[in-house]
Amino acid sequence: IIAVAVVIGFKSEVRNKVIGFGSHIQIANLDAVNSYETHPIAVGDSMMTALSGYPQVSHVQRYSTKPGMIKTDDAFQGMVLKGVGPEFDPSFMQEYLVEGEIPAFSDSASSNQVLISKALATKMKLKLGDKIYTYYIQDNIRARRLTIAGIYQTNFSEYDNLFLLTDLYLVNRLNGWEPEQVSGVELQV
């Protein structure tokens, strides 16, 4: 009985973290299913209003992703920059925030602030307030300097070793997209 209870508890914890990093439902371009290098979909205010109108949907938020690298003097690491906008629900990240704060993410300007996991910060010898250089390969290499505003720790290594959170605006600019273009929409039910 104890073993079954432990397995059920572990399964529930993993499920909650996967949903916390993503959502119950993601609407995205079909070409993006197996890659973090995504093709945009157009999501305007009318679509956000329509999706929010379903009684089963408790929250809707847009997101965009951009794979890249973090580089310090001593190391480099692959990562995915996930941009979220003002409708971002910070409750999941707030639960796992160990240092700093969650910035007020925007879709119309970049704060150049980022949330990074404790695992990545430790691996890269980074701390709260540090400036980090991130690099993105497209037709040419593009670099951005970001400031670590917060450090989170979920102990879910598949995500902790990969994701940095920042403004939707910054990620869309890196992707060369228009304001209504995003990687997808996340729905909580």
Label each region the model flagged.
Residues 1-9:
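Short, strongly hydrophobic transmembrane alpha-helices
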Residues 41-180:
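A structural signal for hydrophobic secondary-structure junctions
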Residues 11-44:
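Membrane-interface junction motifs in transport/secretion proteins
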Residues 28, 63-66, 188:
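Conserved residues at the C-terminal ends of beta-strands
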Residues 31-37, 153-155, 187-189:
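Structural beta->alpha junctions
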Residues 25, 120-121, 180-189:
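A short beta-strand structural signal in non-transmembrane regions
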